[in-house]
Amino acid sequence: MSDQQLDQHELQQEENKLIAQRKEKLAAVREARAIAFPNDFRRDAYFADLQKQYADKTKEELEAAAIPVKVAGRIMLNRGSFIVLQDSSERLQVYVNRKTLPEETLAEIKTWDLGDIIGAEGVLARSGKGDLYVDMTSVRLLTKSLRPLPDKHHGLTDTEQRYRQRYVDLMVNEETRHTFRVRSQVIAHIRRFLSERGFLEVETPMLQTIPGGAAAKPFETHHNALDMAMFLRIAPELYLKRLVVGGFEKVFEINRNFRNEGVSTRHNPEFTMLEFYQAYADYEDNMDLTEELFRELAQAVLGTTDVPYGDKVFHFGEPFVRLSVFDSILKYNPEISAADLNDVEKARAIAKKAGAKVLGHEGLGKLQVMIFEELVEHKLEQPHFITRYPFEVSPLARRNDEDPSVTDRFELFIGGREIANAYSELNDAEDQAERFMLQVKEKDAGDDEAMHYDADFINALEYGMPPTAGEGIGIDRLVMLLTNSPSIRDVILFPHMRPQA
């Protein structure tokens, strides 16, 4: 057994010992009272609200006012005379007043452990150092914790353990709690932003008979009652556009997508996406709307449009760069010429050399995108709208009027990561049917991510869809930026993990 394994074994033995001791204490609680886990305590204040409301009250003013409060929280520190509690908002001290608390309560307090949850009544007071606290007149145990909190000196520092036991991570790491509060703020702000502009929030199917709306490999399941194969959705796009056909001219959805692909710092098989569609608009309108949204989000969450991330700062207050796929390759790779990019064989050779997985049947447009992904994408630090994607890789986007080989599409990159994907929607039913057939050929040639043919969607387009622009924004990656989080797992409460050995 290695030294590390020995240390782990000793730690586990110590933890088991502590758990056994706590179970003995719980047994004593069960014996002493009829209800070991009471549910009749009602608090009337959160710690953060108390700190804010009484911030300007002096020690003498609080003493004269004798403000009664009922608070509850988890014991994070026990200093004898003072117990530090934590609720969902903040930490606050409660004072173990030996003059006012009964002897039996004082004796019970000595048996409590870190992690236990208590409810306390008392009056607000301020210490000589200026700290607000509750001078307890009564207190009782609400929940006995059977497992010890992580060591107070080291905390929960193992990254994988933080992801696997997020409930412990949230207990002991304020930074984690802050991240998920910000995530909630971001989603709430997006909803408000779109609702104020006339968008209707909708819900579309998570289980679909035909996975569509993105180039991705789906999760497959089986509907027993209907005896049919179904798929977890990879995107809501085709259903949202059906709603535009039906007359809802501005719609959005914030919900989960599922893609049966790899796990990395940027990818989780289950992730949250915002998709929105607006009739009588194009992809340039969406660029303007996206810039406005991102600036508002940064200002609301950070109080500034300068977004720190690692050792960089992204400037959301400045105009986002707008550059085509073709021009971006030339700009960031001066050794590549326009003639090279317009020659299939030369483009294939460049893509192979760059490390792209070239199968041999790709057209020029797809090869150009492969080159972009390998040689340009990671260099796009400040916000970039990359536009005019080839139609081969944009089966749902409208062709550009001046150059039909490309589409009216953009992807937004920040910090070398794709954050959003948008385009003027293809509303020509015949063109869409042809592109679906091209995707079917790609799938038959071995491309697992190529789209299926969706006859009902073609049927919907044949009724007529107004000129429309649509966009998808990855909520998880956006929250990563706004919370300075290096991994997507840091912003998903319960990320997918490999089984433990």
Swiss-Prot record:
Subunit structure and binding partners: Homodimer.
What HAMAP family does UniProt report for this protein, alphabetically?
Answer: Lys_tRNA_synth_class2
User: Which positions does UniProt annotate for Mg(2+) 2 binding?
Assistant: E418
- Could you give a single Gene Ontology term from the biological process aspect? lysyl-tRNA aminoacylation
Q: CDD domains given for it?
A: LysRS_core, LysRS_N
Catalysed reaction per UniProt? Answer: tRNA(Lys) + L-lysine + ATP = L-lysyl-tRNA(Lys) + AMP + diphosphate
Residues the record lists as binding Mg(2+) 1: E411, E418
Q: What is this protein called?
A: Lysine--tRNA ligase
Record gene name = lysS
Q: Matching PANTHER family, A to Z?
A: LYSINE--TRNA LIGASE, CHLOROPLASTIC_MITOCHONDRIAL, LYSYL-TRNA SYNTHETASE
Gene Ontology terms: cellular component: cytosol
Family stated for the protein in its record: Belongs to the class-II aminoacyl-tRNA synthetase family.
User: Which cofactors are reported in the record for this sequence?
Assistant: Mg(2+)
Q: Provide the alphabetized UniProt keywords.
A: Aminoacyl-tRNA synthetase, ATP-binding, Cytoplasm, Ligase, Magnesium, Metal-binding, Nucleotide-binding, Protein biosynthesis
EC numbers, comma separated: 6.1.1.6
* Recorded superkingdom: Bacteria
What remark does the entry make about the cofactor? Binds 3 Mg(2+) ions per subunit.
Q: State one molecular function term (GO).
A: tRNA binding
Listed PROSITE patterns? AA_TRNA_LIGASE_II (PS50862)
Q: Which SUPFAM superfamilies match?
A: Class II aaRS and biotin synthetases, Nucleic acid-binding proteins
